[in-house]
Amino acid sequence: MELLLGRDVLTSPGAAAQSPGGDPGRSVKLRLALLSFLMLFVELALIRWLGANIVYLSYYSNFVLLGSFLGIGIGFLRARSRINLFPWTPVALAVLTAFVLRFPVQISHTSGTQLIFFGALKTTGLPTWLMLPVIFLAVAAVMAMIGEGVARTFVLFKPLDAYRLDILGSIAGIAAFSALAFLNAKPLAWGIITAVTLLVLSGTRIGILQFAALASLAGLLTANSLISHDLWSPYYRITVGATTKAQTIPVMVNGIPHQAITAAAKRPAIFYQPYTQAPRNPLNNVLVVGAGTGNDVAGALRMGAKHIDAVEIDPMIYKLGTKLNSDHPYQSPRVSAHINDGRAFLSQTKKKYDLILFALPDSLTLVAGQSSLRLESYLFTLQAIQSARAHLVPGTGVFAMYNYYRTTWLRNRLANTLDVAFGHAPCASSVGQHQQQLSVLTVSVSPAAVDCVSTWHRPSGVLPPATDDHPFVYLASNTIPSFYLLTLGLILLASLVLVRTVSGPYRKMTRFVDLFFMGAAFMLLETKSVVQFALLFGTTWFVNALVFGGVLLAVLAAVETSRRVVITRPQLLYGGLLLALAVAWVVPADSLLSLSVVPRFALAVLIAFAPIFLANLVFTQRFRDVGDSTVAFAANLLGAMVGGVIEYVSLITGYRALLIVVAGLYGLAFLTGRRKLTAAKAETGAVPPTLTARSASTAAT
C-alpha cells in the first residue's frame, strides 16, 4: 500500500513520459479512485460552502464550477511538471477557508433593471470587484493541486482504465456528499472527510506544514461550528435569531433575512385577503406552497381551513417551524406536511383544492450546477399556473400568491400570467413602498367567486409570462445581463492567460480540439438533463443528486462498453447521437408531465440519458488510443468550462435551443476529429462489421 499511502507516483518527468505498460497494481488503482473521490467531493463542498458565506455566489453557483473545471484542467496539464503541487493542497484549502471566514460577503448589487435577486441587502465585507476574482483564482488553485494529484496517477494507466477509475471515484464522491446532505451535516463533517482523505493519500510522507494546515482546517471549521450555531440544510446555511420585541423570530439563510416566525394573530391583514376576498369559499381543502416555518399554514387554520396540504422544499425550515412556531400549525391534525417541490407536488396529486396559495416562495439560491435556475423558477411559469388552475375546485376554487416583488414590472408580469392562465384579470393589492412593498394577487376560476377590492389593469409594455422552456421570471428581457457578460468575459480572459502560462503554446492541445468541443457540448447536455428532471420531478437536492449520479453511471456504461468493443465506424455513433438529440427536440420535457410518475420517469431517463451515453461512446472511442491522456483530458475539461459559459445563452433562447448548440458542437468535434477517426479505423484494420469485440485487456491497448 506504499503508493496509496503517499509515495510519489511520479518521481521525475521522465517517468511521466513513459507509456503505460502492465497493470500498475491494486494500490495505485485505489489511489486514483481515492484522488478522484477527493476531487469531486471538494468541488461540491466548495460550491455549497462558498455560496453560503459569499451571498453573491448563491446566485452564481457555476462561478465556482467554472473555477473548478479551469483548475482541474490546469492540474492535468501539469502532470509532467518537475514540481509536484499536490502536497500543497492542505495549505491552499486552509488559506481559502481562513480567508472566507475572515471576510464573509453579503452582496446585493445587480443592474437593478435586468434581473432581480430577492433578499437584496447592502454589501458587507470586501468589495465585489476584489472578492470574486480572489475566490475564482483560489478555487482554481485548490482544484489545480488536486487535479495534478489525479493526473500524476492517471498517466500510469491506459486511458480508458484511468477514466474508469476516475468515474468510480467520482460516483463515490457524489454519494458521500449526498449522504451528508441527507444527514444535514455541517461543514465540519466535510472538512474532516477531506482532511482524512488527504492524510491517507499523503501517509508517512506528509510534511509538518501540511499536517499543520490540515489541523488548522479542522480547527477553523470546528470553531466556526461552535460559535455560529448555524444549521445546515441540503440548500442553505440557516441562522435563527433572537426573539424580537415584536415577538417574532428572524430566520436567515446564507446570511440574508428570509423569514420571521410570527403568530398568526399578529400578521398584517393583507396576508388574509385571499380569504376575505372569497367569503363564500368553504375551504374544505387548502394547498399552501412555500409553507416555510408555518406562518401561512397557521393563518389558513385561523381562517377555518378544514384540511391543509403544506408543501415545503427544505426539511430543516420545516423542522424549525415544528419547534419554534408558537401556533404549532404543523402539529394540527388538520395539516398534512409534504417535503417536496411545489410544482412536483402539483404534478403528483389528483386532489382538487378550494384554495391554492403560493406563500412567499423565495428560494434565494440556485439549483446546484446550473447557472440560472432557482428552486422556485418552475412555480411561476404559465404552465405552472395552468397546472394550479386545473387543481382548483370547478367554479369556486381560488388561487392566490403574495410576495415582496420589489419592482412594478415583476408584479405586472405575474399578474399578466394569472390573467392569461385564468382568462381574466386578478385582484391586486399592495401595502408598503419600494422594496418593502408586499403585493397580493388573487384570482378564481369564476370571477364571481372573489370580491376584488381592486382589480389589476394591464399597463402598456407588460412582459409576457415566463414559460417552462424559459423560466426566468426575474429576467426583464431575453438577454444576458451586463454583469454576467462582464464576469464571463473576465473568466475566459483569465483562463486563456493561466492555461498559456502553465502549458506553454496552445498548439500542444490543438491535436485534441475535437475533445475540447466534446467537453463543451457535454456540459450543455448535462445542464439540459438537470433542467429536464427539475421540471418533471422537482428542484429538490435529491432529484439533483440522482441526475448527476445517473450521468456518471451513463458515462461508466460507455467506458465499460468501449473497453470491450471497438467501433470501427465512429461516424455511426455521431449519427446515433444526432438522432437522439432530434428525439429530445421533438419530445419536449413538459409533454411528459401529463403521464403518471412511472412512465414519466422511464421516458425521461430514455430521452435524457440516451444522448449522454452515446456522447460518451463518441468520447471514449476517441480517448482510448490517445498518446497523451492527461493533455487530452485537460482539453476536454477546459471545453467543459467553456460549455459552462455558453450555458448562459439559455437566458436568450431558452433551454430547448441548447440542443441545437449541442448538435453544432458535436458537429465541430466530428469535423475537427475526422483525421483521427480515419487513423483509428486504419489501425484496427477496418473490415465490414461495424463492431469488433475484444477482451477488456486487448481493448485498451
Language model: regions and residue ranges:
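Alpha-helical transmembrane segments of multi-pass membrane proteins
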Residues: 1-701
